[in-house]
Amino acid sequence: MIIPIRILGDPVLKTPAKSVEDFDDGLRRLAQDMLETMYDAPGVGLAGPQVGISLRLFVFDDGVTGPTFMANPELGAADGEIVEEEGCLSIPGPFYPTRRFATITCRGQNLAGDPVEMTGEGLLARIFQHETDHLDGALFIDRLSEEGRKAVLAELRRIELGLAEPRQRRRADGE
């Protein structure tokens, strides 16, 4: 089932999420619905708060790992920095160069509640950081300079008014 994606201005996006405690059938259904929503959008990652669920969980597919679920993520060892364009399903349309670690480790739990650890480089590292920001009540525009934030919000307004077209989003399969 596709779940409506919450958009910039929704308070759930600015609220730190709570830990996942119940790894049950309801969580598995939610993960499947989130993946379906992410692919439909299209996007490469989707966090609980983006669908109105204030729990520390996200789903992703970077085109290499396949559909993956992560609960209660904690970011660990990080290395290097890279600035690449970044967008967000909750800020539909605009992209802006955003500084992130080039490589980062993410520890959390899978759908069974078992511990998992993954190290991401490039796009996967960006996904880990972007989605974890959502769980902390932050959006990618919170990482931008005042000038960058204004540029993203101005582009979003132009899109809303029909004066600009939203940029095509990246899909997990690269198309």
Question: Which residues does each predicted region cover?
Answer:
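Positively charged
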Residues: 1-175
